[in-house]
Amino acid sequence: DDRLQYYVSGNYLNRGGLLRHGDDSMQRYTMTGKINAQITKWLRMTYNTRFSRQDFDSPGDLINGTDVFFHNMCRYWPILPTTDPNGNWLPESYIGRLQDGGRAKNQADRLAQQLSFVATPVKGLTLNAELNYRIVTQFNHRDWQTTYGYDCDNNPYVDSNATSSVYEYSFKSNYFNPNLFAEYSHSFGDHNMKVMGGFQSEWFRQRNITARQNGIMSGLPTLDTTTTKPSVGGAYNSWTTAGFFGRINYDYAGRYLFEANLRYDGSSRFLRENRWNFFPSFSAGWNIAREKFWEPLTDYVNTLKLRASWGQLGNQNTDNWYPFYPTIGFSSQGGNWLINGAKPNTASQPGLVSSTLTWE
């Protein structure tokens, strides 16, 4: 049926690492789908979806510094034995750390979806509605196990990670982006005009939680199988934008071109009185190749345009999610002195913020 087209594809990638000792691998699964449907003569729908999952698994000791591992490995003697006479791994070989020093696992899921409708109810008028949604989830697990070397009498001593530990990190973000706009074009004689106007918004939220504990008790490295108090943390961040936009295009016989754009954007990153701003742009052009005096040269140069433009676009990106809030620095047990046998919590004065901060 010409009114309905669909497409589905999948992919699997399994990539082994470079290490002979200790698994070092990456696996990726992807699925993509698309549907185009002509619902009526004047209404068309398009739906796109894409999902991917990536799994990374590597020795936990590499997380302490992959560059350091390869740096040291390249500087050892190539004839260095890997085991001692008793069959134990030599610390200089790094094999014991790779095989028994813990694991680092990372799983990331990404789902992106897009739904759009295009309507042409009357000649020259096009109505567009787009909805974009993206979600990202990530989970990291790392554990560092104590590894040992052995002296000449076969007595063990700590080689790495004197205190075993578990670290876990969970992250999730959501992004939502609706776009609604209309276009109208009309020609009369050699005059051609096109007008476009619409609304756009972005909505972003993210959250993460971290936890770490020391002293793994069993062969199952989890937060519940440790002996110390947990060290936990987390954050929640968000921002939102909204904007109205419009554009006018005009040309005369395809020779003289003019375009004007105007945006009115607002961002949650600024105070209410500085949140909104106008951003105009203009351009004018001359298509010389459309002039009659250029016809003898058309076989040699069929396109030649002169164009001049000026415009502004706003930038809300900063290194601070909420730059207009004065925040107090806080550190748990950050003091360098003892009160009742324990380090106290500390706080610092907030930095200066600008009440006039706005779009760049």
Regions picked out by a protein language model, each given a short descriptive name:
Residues 24-25, 61-63, 297-302:
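Short, glycine-/polar-rich solvent-exposed loops and beta-turns at beta-strand/coil boundaries
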Residues 34-43, 48-53, 89-144, 156-360:
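Extracellular/periplasmic, surface-exposed regions of secreted and cell-surface proteins
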Residues 1-59, 70, 111-114:
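Transmembrane beta-barrel wall of Gram-negative outer-membrane proteins
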Residues 64-65, 326:
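Short, hinge-like loop/turn segments at secondary-structure boundaries
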Residues 149-152, 267:
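Extracytoplasmic gating/loop element in the C-terminal half of outer-membrane beta-barrel translocons
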Residues 62, 68, 358:
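Glycine- and other small-residue-rich loops at beta-strand/loop junctions that grip anionic moieties
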Residues 77-80, 150-151, 159, 259:
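Core alpha/beta catalytic barrel or barrel-like domain that forms the active/cofactor pocket
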Residues 13, 65-96:
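Acidic, glycine-rich flexible loop segments
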